[in-house]
Amino acid sequence: MEQEPLQPRQGDLNWRLSAHPVTLLCFLGIRLSALLMYLFGILFIKHFILVFIITLLLLAADFYYLKNIAGRRLVGLRWWNEVNTTTGDSHWVFESSDPNTRTITATDKRFFWLSLYVTPAFWIGLAILAVIQLSVIWLSLVVIALVLTITNTVAFSRCDRFSQASTFANRALSGGIVSNIAGGLLGRLFK
């Protein structure tokens, strides 16, 4: 009796199942390259300043790509911060794609959210290591990385909650609850 090889299923961590494999690979590549440059850059590039600058540029690229491209293409979410010029107040704006017009694959969602939450955990570990080693200059770079990654993590988490709440409200108003209540009331009137 011969067993069939397991076929990859939607939701597996296999980039070939992604609806947007180029976006996914660029997202993971940029995200991983900042960590790798921080960890191993000094082995290949002997100048600390150059490693610092390259890591900082990779962190900025990661922040931008995640916020503006990967978030929108992989999970249909986007966020930004607006400042009212008259009062100076700032507020977060969340945008999600219409669930009826856009299909988001389980694989893309899984890669996105796993990477979104695991990366700050790595940077927290590196911050603890920098504190233990009393390396203030490396700690400054890790703090910048933490600010950028945690900002994206918090913003996308809020955006996802906002998206789920608005989707629930739209479904309730568009057909589910409202039509049941209206049907029940009309049914009682014409009995």
From Swiss-Prot:
Alphabetized InterPro entries for the sequence: TVP23-like
Residue positions the entry lists as glycosylated: 84
TM annotation in the entry: 17-37, 39-59, 111-133, 137-156
Keywords in alphabetical order: Glycoprotein, Golgi apparatus, Membrane, Transmembrane, Transmembrane helix
UniProt keyword Transmembrane helix, yes or no: yes
GO biological process: protein secretion; vesicle-mediated transport
Protein localization: Golgi apparatus membrane
A GO term from the CC aspect: Golgi membrane
A Pfam family of this chain: DUF846
Chief place where the protein resides: Golgi
Superkingdom of the organism of origin: Eukaryota
Membrane topology: Multi-pass membrane protein
Family: Belongs to the TVP23 family.
Free-text function comment from the UniProt entry: Golgi membrane protein involved in vesicular trafficking.
Record PANTHER family: GOLGI APPARATUS MEMBRANE PROTEIN TVP23
Protein name: Golgi apparatus membrane protein tvp23
Gene from which the chain derives: tvp23
